[in-house]
Amino acid sequence: DGGRHLITFHPRGPGLSSAQVRDADWLDFYMNQSSHAARDLDTGLYVEHDRALTPRRPVIDGEPRYEGIPVGFYNEGHDPRLRFDDDDARQAAWWAVLAGAAGHTYGNNNVWQMWAPGRDPAIGANRPWSDAIDDPGARQMGLLRRFMEAQDFATLEPRQDLILDGPRH
């Protein structure tokens, strides 16, 4: 391919690559990190923001709520027993994609760190990655993919106003 690869910038969360490197010639697509701060954060708002910018670029949420990670783990006084689950992962994905994201990143706390018994866990890893890789949220991303691939992408338009549940309703 002549060394031509897609390049983006992974912002600290919550954050937007467009806030830091929006006009960079090397930036091929905008990435946001909607973060692990709390449940029901509307990931679609990040996508809507970047889709309205110029230069126009595809948008992806590169780090949404990871399945199995403690909710708000970096917030003082968080409860380490409260974890994001498959519903949280699914919600983040659908909200972003229906807002016009070019794709979505699924994350699992135990998988990203390849945690296994006998290894020091980071951010509350508590299940072997080899088990967590089959968590419900991972399987549900396949349903989202199949649904979106069955659509005619050229005719799709973001319609957040049709979502009747969530922070804005």
Where are the regions a protein language model picked out?
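Catalytic-core region of carbohydrate-active enzymes that cleave or remodel glycosidic bonds
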Residues: 3-4, 24-118
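Substrate-access "cap/lid" subdomains that shape
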Residues: 6-8
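Short beta->alpha connector loops
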Residues: 11-15, 35-37
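Distinct, well-ordered alpha-helical segments
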Residues: 15-24
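Aromatic- and carboxylate-lined catalytic core of secreted/periplasmic carbohydrate-active enzymes
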Residues: 58, 67-69, 85-169
